[in-house]
Amino acid sequence: MSADNEDYYDEDPYGFEEENAPITAEDTWAVISAFFREKGLVSQQLDSFNQFVDYTLQDIISEDSTLILEQLAQHTTEQDNISRKYEISFGKIYVTKPMVNESDGVTHALYPQEARLRNLTYSSGLFVDVTKRTYEAVDVPGRDLNYQLIAEESEEDSESGKVFIGRLPIMLRSKNCYLSDATESDLYKLKECPFDMGGYFIINGSEKVLIAQERSAGNIVQVFKKAAPSPISHVAEIRSALEKGSRFISTLQVKLYGRESSSARTIKATLPYIKQDIPIVIIFRALGIIPDGEILEHICYDVNDWQMLEMLKPCVEDGFVIQDRETALDFIGRRGTALGIKKEKRIQYAKDILQKEFLPHITQLEGFESRKAFFLGYMINRLLLCALDRKDQDDRDHFGKKRLDLAGPLLAQLFKTLFRKLTKDIFRYMQRTVEEANDFNMKLAINAKTITSGLKYALATGNWGEQKKAMSSRAGVSQVLNRYTYSSTLSHLRRTNTPIGRDGKLAKPRQLHNTHWGLVCPAETPEGQACGLVKNLSLMSCISVGADPMPIITFLSEWGMEPLEDYVPHQSPDATRVFVNGVWHGVHRNPARLMETLRTLRRKGDINPEVSMIRDIREQELKIFTDAGRVYRPLFIVEDDEELGRKELKVRKGHVAKLMATEYQDIEGGFEDAEDYTWSSLLNEGLVEYIDAEEEESILIAMQPEDLEPTAVEQDIPKENVDLAKRIKVTHHATTFTHCEIHPSMILGVAASIIPFPDHNQSPRNTYQSAMGKQAMGVFLTNYNFRMDTMANILYYPQKPLGTTRAMEYLKFRELPAGQNAIVAIACYSGYNQEDSMIMNQSSIDRGLFRSLFFRSYMDQEKKYGMSITETFEKPQRTNTLRMKHGTYDKLDEDGLIAPGVRVSGEDIIIGKTTPIAPDEEELGQRTAYHSKRDASTPLRSTENGIVDQVLITTNQDGLKFVKVRVRTTKVPQIGDKFASRHGQKGTIGITYRREDMPFTAEGIVPDLIINPHAIPSRMTVAHLIECLLSKVAALSGNEGDASPFTDITVEGISKLLREHGYQSRGFEVMYNGHTGKKLMAQIFFGPTYYQRLRHMVDDKIHARARGPMQVLTRQPVEGRSRDGGLRFGEMERDCMIAHGAAAFLKERLMEASDAFRVHICGICGLMSVIAKLNHNQFECKGCDNKIDIYQIHIPYAAKLLFQELMAMNITPRLYTDRSRDF
């Protein structure tokens, strides 16, 4: 070690000399930093997509790899006796880097920023090795065909080569993306923000995220009780899904008939494609297990368990009639869907169902009947244990029994469907060419659009499935990435969704379950109908991508697992059942040692670390899961320490030192000889371990490293030395822990990790802030100036908060903050801050407090109609253009675009465009000889104004001219704008006072904000006050205040520090009235608090209308601010007016101010059939030959419309006036 390194170690505060010392709370943060440095915050998206591209794609193609078409000899002539067999096989798949094909045929690399600006799709080409072979055989009657491959010389007969089959959208920062290995300077050149984390797709220029979809795991047996009226008391069910491949699901239910009271309680099973429930004994016999004794042995593993055997008696009697396999198969086959077939066919049908559809996850090959029989027995065993009340029913909401489908599985499912469709089309083309005796052309056979547009459609619309079946497919799987604030983007990438109907009133799936601890954020979930169904991952939780179970199964067989085929239950009653991914593979006599070995292998890295192993000692089961979609999180491993004679963390000071050395080297290019010691090193040395929800139930976790130390009682520390104010008390289990939390604050997700002291708030307040933090303005990315987003808000002077949390470091909240530290007084002053409004200092606003930029982009392109007609960007002239808009066209240049820097206001035209009119169109009679074009320009939104910031002219994929215009506005805080602290304390500005009207302290400090004291007590946001206190200390001392949750920081401690700086320890100050200068008669809580400006601004909401546009159909005012609509006088308002008795006002609102209409009615027939010539004052109802008895009435136009619609339905509403009644 060189000298300068030694210095580095000497001045180190951690005391690294003691390599083996236990780590402190501070050291755990070094471990967390290592985790995020390696994993990042969206690793679950990237890993899943990489797995898909690297492995799943090839699996899907290999699964459907060969198409065979046989053309039998036609025997039209003597010589025509040759049968041919055509075979197309798909080989390896290749994925290029992202490319774009321009309209002029040039192909070049496509970088993400260009894709965003030009509305392209960031996607790679897929190429597959396709081999076409032709075989021939001479067809001799009475003999099987013997195909020979035709001689290879003639190249036509055997073609092979890479063939383009479609385009795959690429996830940003995945292995196939250009940004995956770009350095910071590369990113700068590509105009990408180094903070952008990837994990999303770019489809037609818009950024799309795939939301993780939650589902119940397949291949697990679950037992449920049925409610009273049902004839079935208990049911055991399993949803078998094949390990990889078609996600084809087949459900098996084993039902216990009869309630508790009834005598004969039989057990029957529901088989797929069989109409009736089949008694289980018959299924066993169909599987080839004939004697009653053997059947019972498959179900009941203990011969002396008379209760269970008693319950099985009626079942044995139920199947007594059928005593051999043939009859049993026939019994099942008879109840199949196909009717009227012969016995052999029926038996074959039943065999096929038992082989392919019955428990397909065990195997779909034949000859494994005994394994399926044992599994069926196991299901019945579980059912009976529940029925005998020895075991509770299963919990549907247990998070370990759930799986999250991320980008990988979702795309796999879609790609499989599309690839099937493609192969079908190729097969059809083969048939056509063979029938018409044409040449087979690979380019024509493969329609690459199938896959390209299929994937693009699903990602663009979020309807996951084929276009034709849009109704049946899931909606909202792909969403537009939220780019409001950096943290809202991060949070969106870590969101999960449960596809249950939102209107379901079921509370259970929405509740926070114990098993969510550490995996799902307890605070961050929306309010309202999606509450608890949309969740967000905790900071350190990851999702498994799936590992191959084969090595583990092989290992088990070598390590003394007896295969299921040889299992005889009464010989080894204590054997433990071994399951891998829900398949029962065998039994083991020494599970403790086996578990020890498996754990050791996983901690060494010989078994994939994301595999989970659970030994359920009570149930005598050992379950191993390697499948994709399990949520897991890292924990420290605790083991016995020989020297200390107690449990101790395996991670030591020395390891932390190495981690920090590596980090130091990364950041400052420190000493080179330090080995790279990363998170993976910790994993492979068995210091940390991944635990999922299922395995978590078999371990005991300490909350902090301190919990492992012997408690005060054991050490006989005198009572007075025990700190009673310490927030986190020590527990007494120090002997049995197996793991330890890395840090308890890691149970929170992205949005909740920004809240200071969330452990001091009432829980719904944290939920409110988690939702509001996503609407705060800040800097969403550093390259916002190069982006043309539809909308963007940028805060002028964002600040990092004075009260920070440790997790903010990983959320880059200091680099890209979303708020400012305002000086806040909590006081009643002038009464303009009642009901969650607040008083803001106008002078601070003038100096730039909470000012923000607002960008909006407008987009247009020259569309093509048919071959000849194309729109053009130009400045429309009134002389030759029809239907021009009201706004001014003067600001356009001759090319139809506006120059940057021009000030624009509502309805000004910013993109001029015309469409040629076909010569034969009339255009509703407005057209004259000169008019050759129609206006198709884009005006600025009527309610906005600003300055043109940037204009981009380019071409889109079809080579058409395409333009984006970005308009910039400055938004200054004003009365009605919404702000919030980080504790769900939201409010609007009630009034702004200039500095001289605000109260001031003895030091002459004036607050920026005054909030009302009534906002605090009922909401119990104590953290708001503690944050203020801490920020005050931070501002005085010049350090950041640490407001992380679950630490030892107390109000007591902060108060002490504040006192040392010479302030009142609880943050109170004497203030003076700004109007009179008199001392205020109360001490006022005063200090800095971090406030966020939210996106709801009064200028975007203010709306009024006198007269304006009407709907065409009902002639009532249109709806909505953007269309200058009216304000609806609704049903409830109507009821109030009736209650007030204000009838004339009611009529005025609902008729005169809306859609009053004059009609003439005939006094005889009461219909609106009168022909009125008003200028001649002539009226006539032709049907009644009536010219005199005619009345003019005023009714709402909507009523007139209703009457006419009723007439169209042959219902005649007749209108009579009082006078016409008298006639």
Curated annotation (Swiss-Prot):
Keyword set, alphabetical order: DNA-directed RNA polymerase, Magnesium, Metal-binding, Nucleotidyltransferase, Nucleus, Transcription, Transferase, Zinc, Zinc-finger
CDD domains registered for this protein in UniProt: RNA_pol_B_RPB2 (cd00653)
GO biological process: siRNA-mediated pericentric heterochromatin formation; transcription elongation by RNA polymerase II; transcription initiation at RNA polymerase II promoter
Gene name, Swiss-Prot/TrEMBL: RPB2
Note from the entry: The binding of ribonucleoside triphosphate to the RNA polymerase II transcribing complex probably involves a two-step mechanism. The initial binding seems to occur at the entry (E) site and involves a magnesium ion coordinated by three conserved aspartate residues of the two largest RNA Pol II subunits.
Annotated Zn(2+) binding sites: C1162, C1165, C1181, C1184
EC number(s) stated in the UniProt entry for this protein: 2.7.7.6
Protein name: DNA-directed RNA polymerase II subunit RPB2
Chain ranges of zinc fingers (C4-type): 1162-1184
Enzyme type, top EC level: transferase
Family as reported in the entry's similarity comment: Belongs to the RNA polymerase beta chain family.
One annotated Gene Ontology cellular component of this protein: pericentric heterochromatin
Location(s), subcellular: Nucleus
Pfam families: RNA_pol_Rpb2_1, RNA_pol_Rpb2_2, RNA_pol_Rpb2_3, RNA_pol_Rpb2_4, RNA_pol_Rpb2_5, RNA_pol_Rpb2_6, RNA_pol_Rpb2_7
Domain of life: Eukaryota
Single GO term (MF): RNA binding
Binding residues for Mg(2+): D836
Gene3D superfamilies membership: 2.40.50.150, 3.90.1070.20, 3.90.1100.10, DNA-directed RNA polymerase, subunit 2, domain 6, RNA polymerase alpha subunit dimerisation domain, RNA polymerase Rpb2, domain 2
Keyword Transferase listed: yes
Role, per record: DNA-dependent RNA polymerase catalyzes the transcription of DNA into RNA using the four ribonucleoside triphosphates as substrates. Second largest component of RNA polymerase II which synthesizes mRNA precursors and many functional non-coding RNAs. Proposed to contribute to the polymerase catalytic activity and forms the polymerase active center together with the largest subunit. Pol II is the central component of the basal RNA polymerase II transcription machinery. It is composed of mobile elements that move relative to each other.
Subunit description: Component of the RNA polymerase II (Pol II) complex consisting of 12 subunits.
Catalytic reaction annotation: RNA(n) + a ribonucleoside 5'-triphosphate = RNA(n+1) + diphosphate
Region (Disordered): 1-20
Keyword check for Transcription: yes
